């Protein structure tokens, strides 16, 4: 029987890092299922889901622990629970504005208050084309519960968007985005 494992990985970015990890998983009969990995600053960070034969799991865990000597921290845990059945609507939230502390905090406060689940979040700071000022950009994939009113959520987000001086758009993933006012 295969055991599903979810891992987090962090360490100084270097060539061959992912290959080392993939090699260890393969050497222990593991199957690499899905991952999200990137360089953040000078660090490499990732999340990974694998299946490994139950009898090879302890051996794999020891091999992953040995990566610490090469400056890579790996935390692995068994993912015994079944994946939750998705309910509600998938929605994409995009945020763009001048960078400042608290943008994600304020946006996620509204989302949590409406019972919205953040399924995926990616963000970055980039230089504005003309001014060179720092812009904050985020893309957030949301799972809206059936009880969540999209219009009400949009209204709440628009209220804080003007305070945060950001533009937001909220779109059903199956429909065209409707830009929010700033």
Where on the chain are the PLM-derived regions?
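A conserved regulatory-domain signal marking ACT and ACT-like small-molecule sensing domains
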Residues: 1-182
